[in-house]
Amino acid sequence: MDSDEIMPDEEHPNVPVGDEESDIDEKYPNRPRNHSPTLPFHELFQTLFNPLGEIKKKPAGAVAARRKVGPHGQSAANLNPLERRRDVIERFISRWRKEVGDDIYPAFRLILPDKDRDRAMYGIKEKAIGKMLVKIMKIDKNSEDGFNLLNWKLPGQAATSRMTGDFAGRCFDVISKRPMRTDVGDMLIEEVNEKLDKLSAASKEEQQLPILAEFYRRMNPEELMWLIRIILRQMKVGATERTFFDVWHPDAENLYSISSSLRRVCWELHDPNIRLDAEDRGISLMQCFQPQLAQFQMDSLDRMVARMRPTEEDPVFWIEEKLDGERMQLHMASDDSVPGGRRFRFWSRKAKEYTYLYGNGIYDENGSLTRYLKDAFADGVQSLILDGEMITWDPEQDAPAPFGTLKTAALSEQRNPFSTTGARPLLRVFDILYLNGRDLTGYTLRDRRKALQKAVRPVHRRFEIHPYEEATTKDQVEAALRKVVAEASEGLVLKNPRSPYRLNERHDDWMKVKPEYMTEFGESLDLIVIGGYYGSGRRGGNLSSFLCGLRVDDGHASQGASASKCYSFCKVGGGFNAADYANIRHHTDGKWMEWNPKKPPTAYIELAGRDAQYERPDMWIKPEDSVVICVKAASVSASDQFRLGLTLRFPRFKRLRMDKDWKSALSVQEFLDLKSNVEQEHREKELNVDNSRRKRVKRTAKKPLTVAGYDMDEDVKYAGPSGHIFDGLNFYILTDSSAPIKKTKPELEQLVKANGGMFFQTNNAAPHTICVADRRTVKAASLQKRGDVDIIRPSWIIDCVKQNEIDAGLPDFLLPFEPRHMFFATPGKHDEVASNVDQFGDSYARDTTSEELSDCPESITKLIERLQESVNSGHEMPCGLLFKSLTILFPHRNDDVSESEAKTSSHPSITHVVIDPESSSKEISSLRGKWSRKPGRKVPHIVTVDWVEESWKSRTLLDEERFQPKRCISGIAKPYWPG
């Protein structure tokens, strides 16, 4: 099989298929027993899946009509969609209890296959199933049906558009032409589960093929279609697991959240009248739980410190460094049946087991971590559960390695356990939740940390306790944040040491703080991809930019909406390189569907503009089939082109978040909360700046009152170079000059005279007099009211003299008027003046100054924004504008830095500092320290020269985090100097 057919190693771990029956009886002695055989498999889709799907398709209808209640209560026809779904599920569960018994676990394993952690991954994907079906049905792979199965990602040669992008539906089309049976089969749910257990244990095609062949012989096409959806764990039945759990038992969702065990939900909660005992609401050894999460950053440190709930007796809170790794829980129990006497299991935040990667015992040959934990626990420790972060550690640099290298490092450690230089996994533990049979989640964090320090013996750079600092004020947080900036760390986490551990909850007891970088909105946003746009030029033929959405919360959802519905939010086309595009294609292949404007997928995606369908994508994808990407942006702006009425300005791709699915992507309400926090923070910063300015204001002596434009007795010094540029011209100068150079009225008159011109004190004293003014004085207003005289700004006089000086030796040339030279223009003059500059206001006749270039006209800004928007629609940014709006510093290679460069290096507008990839940690820390010592100032990105080169090659600005310099222990820095 190729990479498109079989799951990656991490998704197909070598773990047991399930517990033996005797072990199950011992573990669950009071589990319910069914009194009769399970229902036939076809009952699942005939009485559950199909009815739920029909509810999803039908319009909701008028509220008043649906709310009519007859004399015998409310009929199913009068229920709203959510109530009708519950009604269908309730009837199925009621029938199961009556005809089968109280053990609904066999059915739930097929209804919610993605929640079944007891059955291993099958290790096969769509292409492998297609190949086996071609063999089973003896179809020519080059035939129409063979092509449709093996190339299901492409539009079928004759398949219905309804099945395009739906592999199970494509299989139904093909199987329907050559079924082994047309009526439903006789396989029971229990029998299907047994066969699926065998299929999950099979690792080769010759083992999988006979199992799939038996399903083909005993099922009709519709049964096989649903079976394939179960194998792929892509059910799409029109109801979420929350609805099923809620109907089954009021404590079901809670128990699943703390155990991630579908089996426990079904067996321990089989009686809806018996609620969970208090002791059963906590965590259990060797059962995965959903961990506590840190709350999002708030608008001010003062508020965050207040949320730590300090008291007079105990005002302390803790500061921890935020690690850039994968959240991991470790379970350990004494077990004499395992070599070494200890059994281990590892789970990620999303309940994915990684025991196969890190080890199940001290002598596990595949254990990239556990082989080092022989002496990692204190005497007397029999069992524990630890919460921490698994990161990649680079022993050569003695520093964390970049995000995304963890699994590679773990696999490398498995293959070469004696390497002392290769990257390795390091578990940083920050909490203990269970010790020697006692649940510690109800104890305070301070007490849990004491227990952790007594129970664990750290193993250097393999298994360590994550340090913390005690603090009482926001100043200490700011100091820690400056240290984070200097060390290029992820951020901080503030923790309340008086708080219990809150399972499956994002609470203010833990709050994350991140440094704010130049040119960025603040928080990285994890957005779900819901649409794609084909590119042009080098990007042509593929989806090169993506429509991202915000998950709709219950509070924003319309009645009857899909649980996975999203609002359109922004288009992202910048920051992707070739590998990023390939990775997204790999995870979404075959799941894209062409957007049909006549039948838009409003159950999943809601665009702006209603029927106009603003920013309509070329292709769309269901949120549950899609990927989550991390996006950075310059700011948030209003836009009627996106459903929320807001969008991101200049969004840029950072990385793919494979640790998240659509359910954990950013929701509408979460984004609005983040936006509110950022805006409040900016307001407070502006207020602080204003207050500090007021403190520094100095009193100045009052100037004597003068009449503007009238100062005849002023002593005029030399006003500038002399020449003949104004020979034969008459001037009436009304005011002084304020820009680009300040000159008094007499100084301007002297400048005119020195260059061959004559000046007068009225506009009627000589013919064709040029009137000059920079402010609307009484005389200037009078001339303007007459409307028959052009009034020129003094800047034209200054520009003429300056250009004549630049062109010394050439014939004198009088500059034509430009729009910037006109204080007032008579009718018809505007077009003449406008023709003397380009679309950006750049003169055709004179040299543009650096001051004018730095003061970018609004037209250029708008053009840049249009070009940036075109990037997000699949076009390329012109190379010359790739680094527009950035201020990049290239430090000098010499140790002796000039005073001017030292001043430049601390300039507040610097966004990036480019250094040599081999620079030492000493030099890098010194660079970061320059900005970390400046409170309130945004931090520039420190990157290697590879960022410039790779961005240039990719024709887009790539994420800076990928190009951060490695941190070394010693040595002399080698700053990069171009050329």
From Swiss-Prot:
Localization (cell): Nucleus
EC number(s) stated in the UniProt entry for this protein: 6.5.1.1
Binding site for ATP: 320, 322-323, 327, 389, 430, 490, 495, 512, 514
Residue numbers spanned by region Disordered: 1-39
Single GO biological process annotation from the record: DNA biosynthetic process
Gene Ontology CC: chromatin; DNA ligase IV complex; nucleolus
Active site: 322
Chain positions recorded as Mg(2+) 2 binding sites: 490
List of residues binding Mg(2+) 1: 389
BRCT domain segment(s): 721-814, 867-965
Entry cofactors: Mg(2+)
MF annotations from Gene Ontology: ATP binding; DNA binding; DNA ligase (ATP) activity; metal ion binding
Keywords: ATP-binding, DNA damage, DNA recombination, DNA repair, Ligase, Magnesium, Metal-binding, Nucleotide-binding, Nucleus, Repeat
Superkingdom as given in the UniProt entry: Eukaryota
Function: DNA ligase involved in DNA non-homologous end joining (NHEJ); required for double-strand break (DSB) repair.
Stated family: Belongs to the ATP-dependent DNA ligase family.
Designated name of the protein: DNA ligase 4
Protein species of origin: Aspergillus fumigatus (strain ATCC MYA-4609 / CBS 101355 / FGSC A1100 / Af293)
